[in-house]
Amino acid sequence: MSLFDHKISELKELLHKKELSVSDLVDESYKRINEVDGKVQAFLALDEEKARAYAKELDEAVGEKDELGLLFGMPIGVKDNIVTKDLRTTASSKILQNFDPIYDATVVNRLRDAEVVTIGKLNMDEFAMGSSTENSGYKATKNPWNLNTVPGGSSGGSAASVAAGEVPFSLGSDTGGSIRQPASFCGVVGLKPTYGRVSRYGLIAFASSLDQIGPITRNVEDNAYVLQAIAGVDQMDATSANVDVPDFLSSLTGDIKGMKIAVPKEYLGEGVGEEAKESVLQALKVLEGLGATWEEVSLPHSKYALATYYLLSSSEASANLARFDGIRYGYRTDNAENLIDLYKNTRSEGFGNEVKRRIMLGTFALSSGYYDAYYKKAQKVRTLIKKDFEDVFEKYDVIVGPTTPTPAFKIGEKTSDPLTMYANDILTIPVNLAGVPGISVPCGFANGLPLGLQIIGKHFDEGTVYRVAHAFEQATDHHKAKPEL
């Protein structure tokens, strides 16, 4: 049994009793990375020397402290688009291949306050644009359940590292499903918080109105622990919400009697695989057995979500990625005779194909003559999608459905057709457009590959999302399954 099979609360208890040391946990993490990361390819950079030194420092402090930090001594992996001071951060792009940040993201600072140990940086799709981690500028991460399949994306390294037992939890970011989809593919728990719940300061931006940082863990309780540590308003991020942070752990009661669950017919319709549908129907039976009731509802504008998302996110990416020009930081071409050539060649050599595709799409959508027809119309549809969710939440506590239409697909299977790749996020994208919280928890298997149940809540009501997810988890054994590597 791995140390990381224990919950965070159990590990903290062992540390407090001095039956376990932080150095033991860090040793376990690097030992496992050495054993399996050659196959899984989750990590891009390791911070071993500093991690071991900090672990020793924390061990020495155990006897001197009355109270340990919320996540005291826990090893963590951080997605490579979250800046870490003096630890290379590339967003998995060649254009940032030698970028060493001079500051820490707010979430990294808050985790340091909670006394975690950063193990290293995790692979992802370049600039978080992708659903399979095949768009990384460095390597493709593999799914620990089947090394011939993708781990999902864009937080593929974050999900794979937790599923493979390399770290007990990780941070990811979610713009259109990039935490929940890989969590589903890898059989772990991933939460996209409400937009504004967690500071984005220090997150390398893809689409600023959609991006949100969140935790990936092995169980729901651990997920609540991590969100507790990173949530809250931040003066460095004007989009972070000045909303009280409740005690998320107090929501994990196991009691969902009388709760009303909505199941969108669009989430069990065309394009959703039979295995995903069946796993959700079985999950609903479990939730009924726990005292909840469910009814079918409609989110009528969700059919426009995919097109709306790609217009808006690509438009925002076009603006956000304009800063990577070869002048201020990152890669600079050697092949330029003038300033215009420098810009063009740096960007064409530094960005991968998917990033270029989305920059071009976004630039087109924002261009004169097309702005009203595309970008402005997409903003109006986004408002309608948000209204659909608000209407449902007037009568229901949560919305439930599959996280993804299918289990993980084979590496290389969808790279030649971007549209089939994009369609993989069709069930997660509406949540980002509406800005509401959503979690994926393991709910079954298809052909030996995990499936995820998506539970969606009202704005700033992660507590109820956690309550339902935890009750389901406690009534099933799906989260206990581990891949064999």
From Swiss-Prot:
Pfam families in the record: Amidase (PF01425)
TM spans (from-to): none
Keywords: ATP-binding, Ligase, Nucleotide-binding, Protein biosynthesis
One GO process term, biological-process aspect: translation
Active site positions, chain numbering: 79 (charge relay system), 154 (charge relay system), 178 (acyl-ester intermediate)
EC number: 6.3.5.7
GO cellular component, one term: glutamyl-tRNA(Gln) amidotransferase complex
Alphabetical list of Gene3D superfamilies matching this protein: Amidase signature (AS) domain
Reactions the enzyme catalyzes: L-glutamyl-tRNA(Gln) + L-glutamine + ATP + H2O = L-glutaminyl-tRNA(Gln) + L-glutamate + ADP + phosphate + H(+)
GO molecular function, one term: ATP binding
InterPro entries: Amidase, Amidase_CS, Amidase_dom, AS_sf, GatA
Family from the record: Belongs to the amidase family. GatA subfamily.
Entry function: Allows the formation of correctly charged Gln-tRNA(Gln) through the transamidation of misacylated Glu-tRNA(Gln) in organisms which lack glutaminyl-tRNA synthetase. The reaction takes place in the presence of glutamine and ATP through an activated gamma-phospho-Glu-tRNA(Gln).
Subunit composition and interactions: Heterotrimer of A, B and C subunits.
Full protein name: Glutamyl-tRNA(Gln) amidotransferase subunit A
Organism: Bacillus pumilus (strain SAFR-032)
Name of the encoding gene: gatA
